[in-house]
Amino acid sequence: MLEHFCECYFDLSGLILCPVLGSIILLFIPNSSIRLIRLIGLCVSLITFLYSLVLWIQFDPSTAKFQFVESLRWLPYENIHLYMGIDGLSLFFVILTTFLIPICILVGWSGMRSFGKEYIIAFLICEFLMIAVFCMLDLLLFYVFFESVLIPMFIIIGVWGSRQRKIKAAYQFFLYTLLGSVFMLLAILLILLQTGTTDLQILLTTEFSERRQILLWIAFFASFAVKVPMVPVHIWLPEAHVEAPTAGSVILAGILLKLGTYGFLRFSIPMFPEATLCFTPFIYTLSAIAIIYTSLTTLRQIDLKKIIAYSSVAHMNLVTIGMFSLNIQGIGGSILLMLSHGLVSSALFLCVGVLYDRHKTRLVRYYGGLVSTMPNFSTIFFFFTLANMSLPGTSSFIGEFLILVGAFQRNSLVATLRALGMILGAAYSLWLYNRVVSGNLKPDFLYKFSDLNGREVFIFLPFLVGVVWMGVYPKVFLDCMHTSVSNLVQHGKFH
């Protein structure tokens, strides 16, 4: 009876529309009813998260086919329609999205009076668009939602950013990502003219010439590389993180950076396998350089958010190495590391937000000795610092280990350079923790700092559970994605 109920009433359209309906309800509530606004926003986001967990329970990991498939004709053309579904490559990105949105609402809980209901609506709309990106199996609609995510994020950074340069950072973020995607739009139009469809499942059975594959692969790469971001188109990310509110940084690090790598997995690699093999040495070289460069750059930063932002660039370029190893270990490890990064990096930005709420600065030199005034915060910060270093037993370790195994099978030199990047990662992580938590207290007023309150502890708990769960028992996650990853490798004949 329960299975029949779930099959009938739990589908992707309901999941996608849930935050939209919540936003519509909030439009009719006056800003003065702040308690009701907060409660509705939190309830809608939690319902969406529980909805995604039900889909996980119903998900069949033994098949590589798309599940919960829905199709709707929205244009008067036979091969262009709203077509969506999920598989092992996209399932956990949907769950990660629905997990982080309630956190973002809780983060802005105390400042909701100044933010207003528009703040919650912006995050709910952002959730709707990001879930749609991970579910769309039509190239044209994927592009529409892929680009539409920019709008609420532009507003979140530009309106609720924390410093005077927030407008510049918002425009830089918007223009970088928009201009990169123009090439993908042209490629989609070219595909439509050649094949007459934008249906992914049809395109996966279409054989493009090697020359056409290379042209299309480059166009898609120009769009996805900016979102990852890969060097040298990573400049927008540190500025966006520094100026964004804490919840905005959580979405940027936790979800938005995954859109580019997901695009590689969903479209570039399976649709253009010959071009992928051709450009793999280029990706390996670019990613290895980026890991070393950004790790060294991180050691020179003085802003807490910039340190974590550059660390994110290094981790996401490690993800690209794993994906383009084109084997089961590398791709599976890259997906696991993306999920881990979504938890660990988001938690580190929350730690910075805790300090900024109390001190109104993110400069490292103003901190030190917090272990004596904020022991609970120091313990949590230490835990996520270790997770960022990929300590065994934490979520990042398994992902990085599998990526190294996959990379060694493809190119041992690049894998060796990545190992050097891990050493540098440990260096800047420990340096940051030592400067902020250890040593002597700097200004006298640091003695008046309050430790984590109940709401903040409650926010960190799910991250702690997730990081430990993925680190101690990753089989739950790897089993769900294994069949889809194997199918991807076999489809491209990469093995």
Swiss-Prot record:
Q: Does the keyword Zinc apply?
A: no
Tagged with keyword Nuclease:
no
Pfam families, A to Z: Proton_antipo_M
Which locations, inside or outside the cell, does it occupy?
Mitochondrion membrane
Report the InterPro entries cross-referenced here: NADH_Q_OxRdtase_chainM/4 (IPR010227), NADH_UbQ_OxRdtase (IPR003918), ND/Mrp_TM (IPR001750)
* Gene Ontology terms: biological process: ATP synthesis coupled electron transport
Q: Membrane-spanning regions, if any?
A: 9-29, 39-59, 89-109, 118-138, 139-159, 173-193, 214-234, 245-265, 272-292, 313-333, 335-355, 367-387, 388-408, 413-433, 457-477
Q: Which UniProt keywords apply?
A: Electron transport, Membrane, Mitochondrion, NAD, Respiratory chain, Translocase, Transmembrane, Transmembrane helix, Transport, Ubiquinone
Listed GO CC annotations: mitochondrial membrane; plastid
Membrane topology term reads: Multi-pass membrane protein
**Membership in a protein family:** Belongs to the complex I subunit 4 family.
Function per UniProt: Core subunit of the mitochondrial membrane respiratory chain NADH dehydrogenase (Complex I) that is believed to belong to the minimal assembly required for catalysis. Complex I functions in the transfer of electrons from NADH to the respiratory chain. The immediate electron acceptor for the enzyme is believed to be ubiquinone.
Name by which UniProt lists this protein: NADH-ubiquinone oxidoreductase chain 4
Gene it is expressed from: ND4
